[in-house]
Amino acid sequence: MTTATTNPSTYPNAMAVARYVGISASKARRVIDLVRGKSVEEALDILRWAPQQASEPVAKVIASAAANAQNNEGLDPSTLVVATIHADEGPTAKRIRPRAQGRAFRIRKRTSHITVIVESRPSREGRRGGAGESAGGARARRAQGSKAAAAKKAPASSSKKAATTTEASEEAKGGSQ
């Protein structure tokens, strides 16, 4: 793996590149899309349980980038986030598979280059509200508010509904005897 330090953003960062990985770039991208923007710890957790074969080399590159950030740049591993991650196509090895009647089909063994840049971003625990707030937090508050509103309306309507269902069940019992 190749390592280097780049500075495309204002946050301190570190980089790792795995070249000639024996996975096609399209299959690696399926896994990469799962972890883009996540913290390094969360990304490694996701990849540990991902069933795809590409998750192992992607996890190795992320772990390498995190180690580079810690050892070379002196960054705190708990604040690292997968800022940039992408898979480019590498060279394709061509092989032949013999087929019936003297034919031969071509097998393309594809490789890829996986690049990861991790950044040390401040934790979000200290911040509340504002533009940096996650959509999940706002969604949870909206859901909680609607549940409270539904609870205020529910006692009256649920008692009417319960009364009608018991009357209907009594009629059904009385009519069948």
UniProtKB/Swiss-Prot annotation:
User: What SUPFAM superfamilies does the record point to?
Assistant: Ribosomal protein L22
Q: Does the keyword Amino-acid biosynthesis apply?
A: no
GO MF terms held by the record: rRNA binding; structural constituent of ribosome
Give the UniProt entry's GO cellular component terms: cytosolic large ribosomal subunit
UniProt-listed GO biological process terms: translation
Print the keywords alphabetically. Ribonucleoprotein, Ribosomal protein, RNA-binding, rRNA-binding
The UniProt regions of compositional bias labelled Basic and acidic residues, in chain numbering, are: 121-130
Q: What are the Low complexity biased-composition ranges?
A: 145-167
Is this entry keyworded Ribonucleoprotein?
A: yes
Disordered: annotated segments: 118-177
Under the heading InterPro entries, the entry gives: Ribosomal_uL22 (IPR001063), Ribosomal_uL22_bac/chlpt-type (IPR005727), Ribosomal_uL22_bac/org-type (IPR047867), Ribosomal_uL22_CS (IPR018260), Ribosomal_uL22_sf (IPR036394)
One Pfam family recorded for the sequence = Ribosomal_L22
Q: Where is the signal peptide?
A: none
Family recorded in the similarity comment: Belongs to the universal ribosomal protein uL22 family.
Role summary: This protein binds specifically to 23S rRNA; its binding is stimulated by other ribosomal proteins, e.g. L4, L17, and L20. It is important during the early stages of 50S assembly. It makes multiple contacts with different domains of the 23S rRNA in the assembled 50S subunit and ribosome.
Q: Subunit structure of this entry?
A: Part of the 50S ribosomal subunit.
Please identify the protein, giving its name as recorded. Answer: Large ribosomal subunit protein uL22
Its gene is rplV
